[in-house]
């Protein structure tokens, strides 16, 4: 059994690969609660001896995870972005700057697409929102990073004197502060996604397929679906986002299968 570990800014997501089969349901814990990881490891049969993962939560967090795994007799290899792997090339100028989770997620997306696929835009709504594009030639073209919905909301609370920690409906013309904040956050997320969708249409001459992931998707879904209908209409398409549950773990599983 090979463990698959996605150590994100807020959440620790875990899966496994055994004889080509995946976990029936991934595990997820607060990334500060490493005791939950230790307890989960005790439930696994057979006990894993190897793990691969990506870590964007800092060196100390990676070392702490490795130490817990070592107590169970399991070693881990933290994966780093490569210029080319499993048929996917990487246009990032400096590989060391690219978040390993973004790279693994794009690889997970790549492995589910047929040859000759349209451009694909993957939007991940987590602590940060990332909007990354895979071309028909299987090149990761690059993408955007911006604060996720929760971080945007917190920034308004901590960076201003009077704005509340707001939740509310999204409307075209908000007339109440909670609505104004909720709508502004959704509009920022949707606008960034629409920009990258249009950039893909411009670069590749065909409309990108849209894939989404992350815990923030539910909050921004209505505004994104509405805006995608508007930007797609001039091209005769109505993009419908496809939800991916674990694109990072999917990419790690592909790498593990190739080891």
From Swiss-Prot:
The keyword Zinc-finger does not apply. ATP binds at residues 6-13, 127. It catalyses: (R)-pantothenate + ATP = (R)-4'-phosphopantothenate + ADP + H(+). One of its GO terms (molecular function) is pantothenate kinase activity. Its cofactor is NH4(+); K(+). Pathway: Cofactor biosynthesis; coenzyme A biosynthesis; CoA from (R)-pantothenate: step 1/5. Belongs to the type III pantothenate kinase family. This is Type III pantothenate kinase. It comes from Bordetella avium (strain 197N).
């Amino acid at each position: 059994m090979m463990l698959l570990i996605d150590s994100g800014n807020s959440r620790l997501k875990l899966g496994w690969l055994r004889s080509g089969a995946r976990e029936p349901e991934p595990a997820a814990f607060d990334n500060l609660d490493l005791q939950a990881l230790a307890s989960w490891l005790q439930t696994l049969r057979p006990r894993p001896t190897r793990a691969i993962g990506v870590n964007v939560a800092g060196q100390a967090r990676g070392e702490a995870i490795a130490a817990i795994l070592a107590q169970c007799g399991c070693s881990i290899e933290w994966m780093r972005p490569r210029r080319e792997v499993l048929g996917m090339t990487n246009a990032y100028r400096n590989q060391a700057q690219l978040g390993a989770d973004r790279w693994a997620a794009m690889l997970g997306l790549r492995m589910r697409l047929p040859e000759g696929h349209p451009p694909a835009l993957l939007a991940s709504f987590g602590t940060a929102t990332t909007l990354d594009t895979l071309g028909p030639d299987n090149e990761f073209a690059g993408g955007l990073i911006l604060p996720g919905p929760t971080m945007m909301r917190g920034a308004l609370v901590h960076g201003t004197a009077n704005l509340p920690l707001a939740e509310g409906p999204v409307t075209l013309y908000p007339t109440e502060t909670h609505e104004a904040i909720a709508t502004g956050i959704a509009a920022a997320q949707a606008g960034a996604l629409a920009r990258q969708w249009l950039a893909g249409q411009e670069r590749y001459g065909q409309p990108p397929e849209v894939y989404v992931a992350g815990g923030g998707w539910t909050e921004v879904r209505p505004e994104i679906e509405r805006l995608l209908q508007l930007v797609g209409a001039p091209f005769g398409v109505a993009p419908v986002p496809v939800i991916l549950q674990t694109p990072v773990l999917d990419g790690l599983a592909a790498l593990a299968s190739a080891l």
